[in-house]
Curated annotation (Swiss-Prot):
SMART domains: SCY (SM00199). Keywords: Chemotaxis, Cytokine, Disulfide bond, Heparin-binding, Inflammatory response, Secreted, Signal. Self-associates. Also heterodimer of MIP-1-alpha(4-69) and MIP-1-beta(3-69). Interacts with CCR1. Belongs to the intercrine beta (chemokine CC) family. PANTHER family: C-C MOTIF CHEMOKINE 3, SMALL INDUCIBLE CYTOKINE A. It is found in: Secreted. This is C-C motif chemokine 3. It comes from Rattus norvegicus (Rat). Its main location: secreted. InterPro entries: Chemokine_b/g/d (IPR039809), Chemokine_CC_CS (IPR000827), Chemokine_IL8-like_dom (IPR001811), Interleukin_8-like_sf (IPR036048). Residues 1-23 form the signal peptide. Induction: By lipopolysaccharide (LPS). The lineage of its organism: Eukaryota, Metazoa, Chordata, Craniata, Vertebrata. GO terms for molecular function: CCR chemokine receptor binding; CCR1 chemokine receptor binding; CCR5 chemokine receptor binding; chemoattractant activity; chemokine activity; heparin binding; identical protein binding; kinase activity. GO terms for biological process: antimicrobial humoral immune response mediated by antimicrobial peptide; astrocyte cell migration; calcium ion transport; calcium-mediated signaling; cell activation; cell chemotaxis; cell-cell signaling; cellular response to interleukin-1.
Amino acid sequence: MKVSTAALAVLLCTMALWNEVFSAPYGADTPTACCFSYGRQIPRKFIADYFETSSLCSQPGVIFLTKRNRQICADPKETWVQEYITELELNA
């Protein structure tokens, strides 16, 4: 009985520590989303929102969020990307 109680205590402590390790937030310098390639233009009516990638990413990018919760990377230098961003900002 004592062995199983001790084993249970060790197991519970291990699980608690494991949970803390994997639920900890990333450091402030860890980018959350980066674009490694750019997608093609999609119709504006499918776009719900956007955000810019971190400056720590290897290349600049804009990530458009579609109404179906998909993410599409785009080149921020493209004219259509800038137009979509302007429209989204005006309608916010």
